[in-house]
Each structure stands twice: as structure tokens, then as C-alpha cells.
Amino acid sequence: MSTSSSTARTYRITALAGDGIGPEIMRVGRAVLDAVARQMGFALQWQEGLIGGAAYDQTGDPLPAETLKMAQESDAVYLAAVGDFKYDALPPEKRPERALLGLRAGLGLFANLRPVKVFPQLVGASSLKPEVIAGIDLVVVRELTGGIYFGQPKGIFTDAQGSRRGVNTMVYSEAEVDRIARVAFELARKRRRKLCSVDKANVLEVSQLWRERVNAIAAEYPEVELSHLYIDNAAMQLVRWPKQFDVILTGNLFGDILSDEAAMLTGSIGMLPSASLGSSGPGLYEPVHGSAPDIAGQDKANPIAQVLSGALMLRYSLDQPQAADRIEQAVEAVLAQGYRTPDLYSEGMTLVGCQEMGEKLVAALSQQQAQ
């Protein structure tokens, strides 16, 4: 995980608004980040790039070379959302979502962090009981570049008798496991010092190697309490009693599933940020939710996940943890005041649009400074 020196007071950020609600939530995210930067005495130098469907429409490529170069030369990459139903008929390599794979590969990102925190004001938004939900504060650390999505051989093959079979291969090297394990242990060391590694070591040899290497890396972090769960039990425990978890470490496929399951604990995917990190270079920060083309341009989107992704950027790439804290406190303050976008609205709350939610967040930052 890379961090810039805190003495470098101007940070170059690549902003990728993308598709659907992306431009709306990006405007809010940037406004909040600029506000906290002014308060804390540093500056953000924004550069805008094309990605996804917006890039395809203008260039014929969902990830233009100039966008990737811009991202590689920045201190961090701030992404909103890509994708739209109208691109579904395109060949796979031209679809907006393919840009994310290219961006991750081009930036050397292998660790995806999904924080899941339930704000006290939103306990009632979850479909689970309040006593199960209240106080959840966990992070899923998912390996991004290995496992069954990338292993070879892969494909659909036809044998001599004309019978077809589909093949995918789950592969992890020791080096791949070691580097993602270190990211998770470092994170756990700065949190509540509990790490749960999730695998399927009772059946899969690849998981047996995974567990062996995680145990080996654990020796470097004696202060972190390590436990292991099989993926099926982990999925069950995440719903049964999620507060038992601090940091969850797992591979690409299992992480894909568990992170979405964990996302729904909160009751709104519109609240959840994510970070994707590499060994060096800029990190990528984006909300967990998609581009929601059905509500694009209607001022209905919830910008909080975008805003909280900005807080992660401040924390992990720009070495500005106090600024990140301020943003998170502003979100909590606005929720405590009863303001809700349509996805979170309930009787007795005050309904606001995307833009007004952004204005309330900036106002909350100003109130913090005044105090």
C-alpha cells in the first residue's frame, strides 16, 4: 500500500466520473474532498479522464490509453461508476465494465478492501434484527488478480465425441497469498487485531496452500489473533453474528461473494465505499454500487458511498487520516440530523436529493471546524 508524504501538500487526483449516476455523485465527492482539503491545509489537483461507456462513445474504447496513463501518473484514482444497459450488446472487450479490469491490471492492484460499517442512525434500514446489526465494523480484504477468474486452462472445450465441457482453474501461488495476507495483517494490526482467513481447505488443495501461507505470515504479526473459517461457514456466520469479525481475508471468488453479502448487512449498498491497492503507485477508490442508469440525472442517487470512498483515499493513499475522520464524522452528523436520500428514506426523515445531500455534508464539515 503506497502513501504519499504528508509534506507534499498538493496531491494529483485522477477523477473518473464514468456512466449513469457517476457524474452526479462525483460532483458531490469532489466538493466534500475540496472542502476538507481547505480546512486541513492541503490541495487536490483534479484531472478528469474518460472511462466506461462515456469513453466508448467518444473513443471506441472503454479504457483509453490516455486515461490509464493519467491514472498511473497520479497520487490516487477516484472513480464513480461504469456501465449501462445500452452497452450490453457490445462484444465483451468493449463493454464499460471491462475498463475496470484494465485499470486494475494497469495500476497493479491486487488487494480490494470493502469496509462495512453500520451507522447507528441506519440500524433500521437492514433486513436483519437491530441487535444483530448494531455496531458492525468490519473489512473484507479480497485478493483481486488471482484465483479462478484468471487461472489457466479456462474455456469451453469440445471432445472427440462432440461433448462440450466448461473449464476454469483456481490457482494461487505462494507469492500471491503472501502479499495479500500481509495487507490484511497490516490492516488488522491498526484495527482491533483480529483476522479471519476464509478458504475451503477441507476440499481444495489451492486452499490448503492458502491456509499454510497465511499461517506462515501470521508469525510476523504475533499481536494479531488469527482464525480460519471454511467459506460455507463464513457465509453463515456473517449473517448469524457479523460483529464477531474485524478483518476478513479471502481469495477472489470467495471475496466476490462475501463482500456483496456483507454489503447487504447495512441495508443500503449506497453507503459502502471500497479501495483497491497495490504494492506501490496510486490506489483506486470507488463506491461498491453500480451506475444505476435507471435513476441517472434525476438527483435521486445516494452520494455517501462516493464520499466515503474519498475518505478511504485520504487515509490510504494521501496519508491524511484526520481529514478522513472529518468526512466520516460529517456523514454521521448529517444522518443524525435526519437527512436521507430516497434509498434510505423512511417516515419522519427529511428527503433530500443527491446535490442537497452534498451541500449538507459540506455544511457539516464547516460546523465541525467552527467547533
From Swiss-Prot:
* Residues marked Important for catalysis (site): 149, 200
Say if the entry is tagged with keyword Magnesium.
Answer: yes
Under the heading SUPFAM superfamilies, the entry gives:
Isocitrate/Isopropylmalate dehydrogenase-like
- Top EC group: oxidoreductase
Pathway, according to UniProt?
Answer: Amino-acid biosynthesis; L-leucine biosynthesis; L-leucine from 3-methyl-2-oxobutanoate: step 3/4
Documented EC number(s): 1.1.1.85
Q: Quote the subcellular location field of this record.
A: Cytoplasm
One record GO biological process: L-leucine biosynthetic process
Any idea what this protein is called?
A: 3-isopropylmalate dehydrogenase
Protein's organism: Synechococcus sp. (strain JA-2-3B'a(2-13)) (Cyanobacteria bacterium Yellowstone B-Prime)
**Organism phylogeny:** Bacteria, Bacillati, Cyanobacteriota, Cyanophyceae, Synechococcales
Gene name for this UniProt entry: leuB
